């Protein structure tokens, strides 16, 4: 979904499938484009709309792109791998936005590749998840699924924490189990798991199984970006995960087990 100054823009289509877009440009010095990613087709729409605004004399155009598509392909390991994140960022850079706002990108590669990029503060959303989950530092913990997320978030939150060490089948990439390193309370405790993104939620399912075995009572999950595929995974089954918190950056479907925290966009 794409909005300009808070107004959603919808495309029509010609018989051949190409887009028919209409947008009456207001005579302003600045335009704010929000892109809540739903499909790759929106990239073409973004290009057309941005060029349209520029042709109409809008001097300052900001892009708010909380979720960055292709961010998982932030490196190449084999000669035949296509470095999609790099080429995607080159397209965004070619549009010459005055500022590009992103939220909790998957790695530092994203911010290194984008021009005039600014990170939206993720702490506000995690603080809200901490508040709503009811966990307290005196006897509960924050859990990070791997050492990478532990390094990424632990300096921001002064909370007892532990992190996971995944056991993978290196032929298939499937997670087979998980070990835990860090602080585990001796008495029963509640947990908030924190990470940047979830697809089907396999990592968090195995994390929750291990934490329950170690004495966790209520287990909550916060992910900044939540794909709709989470609804097809095991996290929706039973009460292993008590509740899930995410921002409105990506998820497009509702579920009683998920609280969506609205993004703060500055116009």
Segments the model singles out, each with a brief description of its role:
Residues 1-267:
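PRPP-associated nucleotide enzymes
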């Amino acid at each position: 979904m794409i909005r300009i100054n808070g107004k959603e823009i919808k495309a029509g289509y010609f018989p051949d499938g190409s887009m028919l877009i209409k947008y009456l440009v207001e005579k302003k010095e600045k335009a704010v484009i929000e892109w809540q990613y739903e499909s790759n087709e929106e990239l073409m729409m973004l290009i057309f709309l941005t060029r349209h605004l520029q042709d109409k004399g809008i001097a300052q155009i900001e892009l708010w792109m909380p979720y960055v598509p292709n961010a998982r392909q932030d490196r190449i390991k084999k000669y035949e791998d296509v470095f999609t994140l790099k080429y995607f960022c080159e397209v965004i850079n070619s549009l010459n936005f005055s500022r590009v706002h992103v939220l909790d990108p998957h790695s530092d590669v994203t911010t290194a590749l984008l021009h005039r990029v600014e990170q939206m503060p993720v702490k506000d959303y995690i603080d809200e998840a901490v508040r709503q989950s009811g966990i307290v530092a005196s006897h509960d913990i924050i859990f990070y699924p791997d050492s990478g997320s532990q390094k990424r978030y632990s300096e921001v939150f002064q909370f007892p924490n532990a992190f996971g060490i995944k056991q993978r089948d290196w032929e298939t990439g499937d997670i087979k189990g998980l070990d835990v390193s860090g602080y585990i309370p001796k008495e029963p405790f509640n947990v908030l798991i924190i990470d940047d993104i979830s697809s089907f939620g396999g990592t968090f399912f195995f994390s929750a199984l291990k934490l329950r075995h170690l004495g966790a009572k209520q287990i909550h999950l916060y992910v900044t970006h939540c794909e709709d595929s989470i609804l097809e995974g095991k996290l929706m089954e039973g009460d292993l995960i008590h509740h899930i918190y995410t921002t409105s950056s990506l998820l497009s479907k509702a579920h009683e087990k998920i609280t969506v925290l609205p993004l703060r966009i500055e116009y």
